[in-house]
């Protein structure tokens, strides 16, 4: 039998299991996606998906006419709350009058439930639907009503070519190659990787439905993020209760981002 040298554990839900397995195979390197537990042979990895989420918010804010944007969300955890907030901050920058209405599904993947949530938001009058789900059901539901859609994870344009605007996307291959090279060069050490657009592990895709001027604006904001000239969470940021979380020019630390449990004030719905 050939010895396995590297294992990627690709879901948050695998965390406790991979911790136990790593103890039993000290000669194998384990990398766990989106977790927070580490060991000598166990590291974690994720991406700053909030960066492209902010950019898609700019698009949604510009494209809405009703000033009501729907968001189909998975779980009330910092990863998801952070992404919704980044999206909402982008929306507010483009359109201070727009609100984001959030419906929670409490699942990563349940197409029928996701479609139901999207339909409820469409019935409220949403003319843009965004999501943090693993299926394209919300995108498809929007498309069936002729409403703009913003996907998640991958380019979902094939599921609603006439209404798909944009999506934050993952480029995991770049990270996998990096880890494999570190291991082959005997340079791998356990760490907690959190890469952004500048690393190539996350990015944004846009369809031709995005007007040229808006596309140029998004590209410029993307460039500023890469050059560390702009942070999506740069203050002033005010939460739903009217508290100033970050004053002008202030930005949260990574620790604060990783523990985020509050919504900015243009979101309708509770993060609790």
PLM region descriptions:
Residues 1-272:
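A residue-level marker of the well-folded mature domains of exported/periplasmic proteins
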């Amino acid at each position: 039998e050939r010895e396995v040298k590297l294992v990627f554990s690709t879901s948050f839900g695998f965390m406790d299991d991979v911790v136990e397995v790593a103890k039993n195979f000290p000669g194998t390197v384990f990398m766990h996606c989106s977790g927070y537990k580490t060991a000598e042979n166990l590291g974690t990895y994720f991406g700053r998906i909030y960066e492209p989420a902010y950019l898609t918010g700019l698009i949604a804010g510009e494209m809405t006419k009703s000033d009501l944007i729907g968001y189909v969300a998975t779980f009330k955890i910092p990863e998801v709350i952070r992404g919704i907030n980044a999206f909402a901050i982008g929306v507010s920058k483009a359109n201070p009058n727009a609100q984001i209405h959030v419906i929670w599904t409490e699942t990563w993947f349940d197409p029928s439930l996701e479609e139901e949530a999207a339909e409820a938001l469409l019935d409220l009058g949403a003319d843009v639907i965004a999501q943090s789900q693993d299926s394209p059901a919300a995108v498809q539901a929007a498309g069936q009503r002729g409403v703009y859609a913003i996907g998640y994870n991958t380019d979902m344009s094939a599921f609603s070519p006439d209404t798909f605007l944009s999506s934050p996307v993952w480029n995991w291959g770049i990270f996998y190659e990096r880890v494999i090279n570190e291991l082959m060069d005997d340079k791998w050490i356990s760490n907690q990787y959190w890469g952004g657009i500048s690393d190539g592990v996350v990015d944004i895709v846009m369809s031709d439905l995005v007007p040229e001027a808006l596309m140029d604006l998004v590209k410029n904001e993307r460039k500023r993020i890469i050059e560390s000239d702009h942070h999506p969470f740069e203050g002033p940021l005010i939460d739903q209760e009217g508290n100033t979380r970050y004053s002008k020019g202030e930005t949260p630390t990574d620790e604060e981002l990783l523990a985020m449990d509050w919504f900015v004030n243009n979101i309708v719905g509770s993060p609790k």
